[in-house]
């Protein structure tokens, strides 16, 4: 387009065609570019085509309607790409990305059990992280745990009160009971509250006893959390913890610098940054507190420090934060102050990957029957119970060991896929029946689609090595459509990496399973008398199997060979 006179800002808007009669891909940006140039769109489209050299890729290029360019891919080129992809460990996808990306996700609180509210951040973040790494990025996981604040003064003071300093022997459920009791004392006993506040000061000033107790609380919590991460097949480890305490020593200097720059001003004893970009109810610039009048700091101050640290110390090109949509304004304000203060350059990408809420069938936030918060471990236990019942009914031919593997894969996979398959920015309804169904866009359906293709090779006398030199021949439209869909895997994961939207990959995998099903129905494989066609179709099946497995792995969902 540029060679035809369009400016460098013009986008060809090449998209997959919605209907086969419009080709495989369609360039939709011609009319907008022609309008800017004051040219006839169809004439401009013709000029663009003359500048293109797609002779090896497209068998036909045509102009449609007022100026769309339709591309029909060449089947020999498609066959060649399939052959390259099926023999490649990365399915033909080149590792072209070399950015350093910090991903801040999961972020539970210390001295509390993980609950369903942590599920979305944990699994959405992990799917995006896996995808970024697959594409060649260096990813630094940052588990921004809540490991600082007044609650630690309360806990240490209460543990001391009940003469139980052996925190390392406690289960986290005990810690939660301690937390509730400590909070009751804090609210009702002024002497206890004063002691708790003193312990916070001691902790912040590095008191050895307080630091030791604090470290015990953190370690117990993270051991319990690691058990949840392992069950969820999430890649976070204790090495990825970058809690609030990491940034605490930086906060005084940041506030001092904001004051020196004239960004933070005193207001009733607190220090506030006023932002013209945000207005309060009176239409005046909104004030964002960075230091309270008692000298304490806020989450905003910590998030400014985190952004600065991720750029200066971790040398990142991009920082992603996976948290609730309700934190959107907070993140925007923290990052706006970060940029105004000059802590990061414009080239440093700060991206809030926000998500909606998990709702019950009643449309309200997901709770226990008694209205309490659902613990993540309890949710996963229930998933295993329900999957056990389902698999016992359906998989009678499996050994006990095989059955156990299927149950775990289906149970955890169902919970994760039900979430990941929804656009993260929307709320979604948590429904056991839907997520454990073998029909529709669900984990069991996708896992079963994978095992069905595995079974083809179990029945075949040919293995992957036997097929390595066999050519791919696309002799009919079903084969051709499957080949195109297989090569669109890279497009799907590029979107996930850029936008942080795993549902795009889920949709792609579900569509791929559907296209394969149609291919399998109309194109005999194992009983085909033409050996070349048989081998070619086996290669298409093999690449489909590999793509489903790799795609589900990027989502953190396990596959099994038998179901």
UniProtKB/Swiss-Prot annotation:
Top class in the EC scheme: ligase
InterPro entries: aa-tRNA-synth_I_CS (IPR001412), Arg-tRNA-ligase (IPR001278), Arg-tRNA-synth_N (IPR005148), Arg-tRNA-synth_N_sf (IPR036695), ArgRS_core (IPR035684), DALR_anticod-bd (IPR008909), Rossmann-like_a/b/a_fold (IPR014729), tRNAsynth_Ia_anticodon-bd (IPR009080)
One of the record's GO cellular component terms: cytoplasm
Family: Belongs to the class-I aminoacyl-tRNA synthetase family.
CDD domains tied to this protein: Anticodon_Ia_Arg, ArgRS_core
Motif ('HIGH' region): 108-118
Gene from which this protein is expressed: argS
Pfam families assigned: Arg_tRNA_synt_N (PF03485), DALR_1 (PF05746), tRNA-synt_1d (PF00750)
Subcellular location, record wording: Cytoplasm
Protein's name in the database: Arginine--tRNA ligase
Subunit note: Monomer.
Keywords noted in UniProt: Aminoacyl-tRNA synthetase, ATP-binding, Cytoplasm, Ligase, Nucleotide-binding, Protein biosynthesis
């Amino acid at each position: 387009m540029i060679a035809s006179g369009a400016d460098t800002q013009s986008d060809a808007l090449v998209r997959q065609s919605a209907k086969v009669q419009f080709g495989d891909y369609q360039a939709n940006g011609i009319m907008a570019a022609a309008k800017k140039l004051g040219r006839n769109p169809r004439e401009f489209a013709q000029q663009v085509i003359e500048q293109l050299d797609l002779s090896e890729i497209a068998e036909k290029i045509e102009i449609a309607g007022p100026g769309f360019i339709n591309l029909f891919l060449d089947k020999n080129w498609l066959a060649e790409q399939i052959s390259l992809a099926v023999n490649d460990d990365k399915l033909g996808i080149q590792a072209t990305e070399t950015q350093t990306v910090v991903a801040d996700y999961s972020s539970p609180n210390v001295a509390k059990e993980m609950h369903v509210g942590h599920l979305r951040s944990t699994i959405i973040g992990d799917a995006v992280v896996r995808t970024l790494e697959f594409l060649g990025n260096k990813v630094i996981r940052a588990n921004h745990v809540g490991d600082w604040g007044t609650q630690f003064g309360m806990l240490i003071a209460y543990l001391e009160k009940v003469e139980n300093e052996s925190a390392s022997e406690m289960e986290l459920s005990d810690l939660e009971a301690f937390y509730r009791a400590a909070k009751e004392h804090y609210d009702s006993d002024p002497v206890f509250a004063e002691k708790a506040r003193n312990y916070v000061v001691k902790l912040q000033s590095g008191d050895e006893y307080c630091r030791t107790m604090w470290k015990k609380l953190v370690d117990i919590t993270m051991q319990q959390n690691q058990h949840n991460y392992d069950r969820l097949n999430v890649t976070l480890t204790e090495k990825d913890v970058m809690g609030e305490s990491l940034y605490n020593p930086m906060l005084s200097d940041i506030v001092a610098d904001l004051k020196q720059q004239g960004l933070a001003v005193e207001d009733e004893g607190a220090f506030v940054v006023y932002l013209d970009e945000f207005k309060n109810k009176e239409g005046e610039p909104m004030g964002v507190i960075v230091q309270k009048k008692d000298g304490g700091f806020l989450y905003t101050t910590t998030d400014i420090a985190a952004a600065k640290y991720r750029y200066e110390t971790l040398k990142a090109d991009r920082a992603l934060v996976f948290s609730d949509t309700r934190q959107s304004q907070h993140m925007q304000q923290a990052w706006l102050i970060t940029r105004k203060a000059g802590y990061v350059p414009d080239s440093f990408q700060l991206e809030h990957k926000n998500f909606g809420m998990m709702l019950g069938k009643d449309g309200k936030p997901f709770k226990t029957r008694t209205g309490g918060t659902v613990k993540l471990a309890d949710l996963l236990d229930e998933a295993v119970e329900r999957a056990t019942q389902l698999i016992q009914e359906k998989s009678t031919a499996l050994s006990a060991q095989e059955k156990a593997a299927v149950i775990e894969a289906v149970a955890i996979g169902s919970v994760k896929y039900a979430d990941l398959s929804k656009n993260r920015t929307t709320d979604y309804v948590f429904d056991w029946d839907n997520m454990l169904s073998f029909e529709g866009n669900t984990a069991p359906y996708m896992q079963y689609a994978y095992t069905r293709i595995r079974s083809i090779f179990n029945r075949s006398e040919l293995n992957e090595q036997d097929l390595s030199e066999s050519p791919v021949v696309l002799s009919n439209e079903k084969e051709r459509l499957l080949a195109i869909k297989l090569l669109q895997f890279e497009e799907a994961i590029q979107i996930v990496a850029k936008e942080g939207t795993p549902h795009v990959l889920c949709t792609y995998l579900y569509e791929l399973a559907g296209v394969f099903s149609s291919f399998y129905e109309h194109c005999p494989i194992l009983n085909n008398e033409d050996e070349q066609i048989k081998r070619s179709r086996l290669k298409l099946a093999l690449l489909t199997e590999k793509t489903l497995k790799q795609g589900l792995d990027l989502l953190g969902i396990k596959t099994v060979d038998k179901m």
